[in-house]
Amino acid sequence: MGIQTAAANDVAQHTPMMQQYLRIKADHPGTLVFYRMGDFYELFFEDAEKAARLLDLTLTQRGASAGNPIKMAGVPHHAVEQYLAKLVKLGESVAICEQIGDPATSKGPVERKVVRVVTPGTLTDAALLSDKSDVYLLAMCVAHNRRGVATSVGLAWLNLASGALRLAEVAPDQVAAALERIRPAEILVADTPSDSASWTPPVNAGALTRVPVWHFDVTSGTQRLCDQLEVAGLDGFGAHSLTCACGAAGALLLYAAATQGQQLRHVRSLKVEYESEYIGLDPATRRNLELTETLRGTESPTLCSLLDTCCTTMGSRLLRHWLHHPPRESAVAQARQQAIGALLDAPPGASIDSLRGALRQISDIERITGRLALLSARPRDLSSLRDTFIALPELRTQVAAVAPNADSLARIDASLEPPQACVELLKRAVAQEPSAMVRDGGVIARGYDAELDELRDISENCGQFLIDLETRERARTGIGNLRVEYNKVHGFYIEVTRGQTDKVPDDYRRRQTLKNAERYITPELKTFEDKALSAQERALARERSLYDALLQALLPFIPDCQRVASALAELDLLAAFGERARALDWVAPTFSANAGIEIEQGRHPVVEAQVEQFIANDCSLTPERKLLLITGPNMGGKSTFMRQTALIALLAYVGSYVPARRAAFGPIDRIFTRIGAADDLAGGRSTFMVEMTEAAAILNDATPQSLVLMDEIGRGTSTFDGLALAWAIARHLLAHNGCHTLFATHYFELTQLPAEFPQAANVHLSAVEHGHGIVFLHAVSEGPANQSYGLQVAQLAGVPNAVIRAARKHLAHLEQQSAAQPAPQLDLFATPMPMLLEDADDERDAKAEPAVPPAMQELVERLRGIDPNDLRPREALDLLYELHELAAAPDADH
């Protein structure tokens, strides 16, 4: 048992300060406690050991309590954010314990309390947040039937930095997909065995926090949600029937409020998400399409990194949300594209470049508003909010010029009206360039508060006051050598030499007698002294009081600030889409109620940006042509063609323009991808198991409105098993699912599928042999491929020439066997060739790939080691015989 745990069992044995600490720690088990002591936050006992290990701090021992040494580690208060950021990234939570009592008047330890708890899912400080991605806290409530089997999962997730709260209910088998979409930083679950057994968090899920099961009570959760939203019922939000989600929301709100130590004033709206509202993207699809993260785990190059030319961080965060939530309803996409078109066609005075220039003056008022609601906004947050509001009229003028051409822009224009009372208050109250922290002063503007101005004047103009007083007193008394001075012992005084003391007025009171002078103080100087000696301290205290009152006065404007922030984010993202469309030569797609996908000269948006020249391709999927069998060599571009089709479709439904000459889309409900695979070591699944699991999900869930990408299904097992599975899966997709499918394969036998199913068609990506190498054309053509070029690709990859030669010989042998035994050619595209061609092939290979046999290699090495200038005639003759024998060796006969 650790000292901290043991010590807590008998608090009375400890020193008063340790008693205080242990009581606070007992209320926050499992959380690191940052205990404020002067200019440091200290950690004790096991917390100190853990923090020292995680943060690379020095672990010390100072004194003892209850007979045990006190282990300590500390961080300076002015740098606490950087340490909090490290701990949060490691999934730790930290309770911030501040001194709230006055050390000067406290008897015993200064009173302290936890003012907030920083957890991975409840971040609001700018220093702890990523500018371009949101942080979500999610709670999960699981409903069970009488047999204890999970039947439904309620989800509630909150972006505390903005106040956005959302609910959803999903089937238990859809939880992983929901978490992949939301990407919560922290997940709250009930601390009951039934919930723990019914759900296993994915490997990349956020930090898991267990809370008491009663937090998820549906009745109290529903009431807590109504109280938070200030409504009598949830019917207006469409959440009245989501009992499980309401239970999750109750636990989430209780936890979030506890971490902040106050109400969540900015959480006043609710959005219910339904599966039918968005195009379904399972975890594999989100990864394979590399929307916001590459397969290597980096943020670039991705679709998001290509599109993100936003001028504000609010727009960048909205972009990520839109990419992961493409709406199924084409009307949403069409409204966004209409707005993009209006921005691109704007008159010169309201051009998209001019608009984006104005947007660059905008601050992240979404997060500023969140901190304002939590009363944690800093002075520069308020000045940024003020400056943003001041910049809005110019921005609105430009938006108003194009608003008549797009309903979305008209709505945005109306939402950009700032709350004038808030603007005026900020202009009057906040200094033009305030200090970073209130404690530094210089935050409240001059003229806002007369008392503060007077205190500042006293503090700043003390010297001038003394000069003015000295001048006046000399004139009043006629004492020419009178001096007004100050020292730390006696304070302010008027000094008069002994020879002039008879001229001292009656209101002078003697303060000190010196050998040659008398020192006096007057009522006026005493009053000034009282003010001056405490002016700076009182000014800072007054400023703190005024600042706190200002934050309270700004609270009623939070809904207006949120409205403006939301409009700015949407405007910024639409303008970024317009800039990308113009710069990258993208076009507006069209939509139809008829099923199908028609893309003319489509391009992969991300790959195109990485290469000098990209080959555009067409893609046509119709009710009469539902499945394209794609064949061709490795590296020929099959996967790129498939991914670009899915990305163009997703971009269209997000509302962006698309990389194509023309594009038209029918309804799409889900996008599935089965592209590539790797072992799931953590889940105990092989590559083939992962592949089959993804294929099963597609076969079970794809509908006639789904877009499916299948890349080389069946390759992870034996040739016959793989071919049989690939054939059966393709047939099932055609006959039962009826979905739009791009099916890439190396099984040449599958190219016979269109003979059985007219809805299938063959296309291929071609390549040509050039000299001794291969050139990939990356062009999609009708019909099946006739060669795989596998050996040429292996050669390009650097496989040793000896291995390539051996492969060619074995390939010819297999082809001869295939010709002798009439059976399907498996996995190979090449026409069977007789063994008689082996020698000719080898001769050609030798010319194409000048391999060096072992004997020849020895000969070459021997020659390299000889210097002819050093050989005597006899040595040269002996060497000649030696080299002749080497050259005559069997392996050198080439």
UniProtKB/Swiss-Prot annotation:
Could you list this entry's UniProt keywords, alphabetically sorted: ATP-binding, DNA damage, DNA repair, DNA-binding, Nucleotide-binding
- Tell me which stretches of the chain form a coiled coil: none
The terms describing its cellular component in GO are:
cytosol
**Gene3D superfamilies associated with the record:** 1.10.1420.10, 6.10.140.430, DNA repair protein MutS, domain I, MutS, connector domain, P-loop containing nucleotide triphosphate hydrolases
Record-linked SUPFAM superfamilies: DNA repair protein MutS, domain I, DNA repair protein MutS, domain II, DNA repair protein MutS, domain III, P-loop containing nucleoside triphosphate hydrolases
Q: Which GO terms describe its molecular function?
A: ATP binding; ATP-dependent DNA damage sensor activity; damaged DNA binding; mismatched DNA binding
| UniProt organism field | Paraburkholderia phytofirmans (strain DSM 17436 / LMG 22146 / PsJN) (Burkholderia phytofirmans)
Corresponding gene? mutS
The name on file for this protein is DNA mismatch repair protein MutS
PANTHER family for the chain: DNA MISMATCH REPAIR PROTEIN MSH1, MITOCHONDRIAL (PTHR11361:SF34), DNA MISMATCH REPAIR PROTEIN MUTS FAMILY MEMBER (PTHR11361)
Q: Which family does it belong to?
A: Belongs to the DNA mismatch repair MutS family.
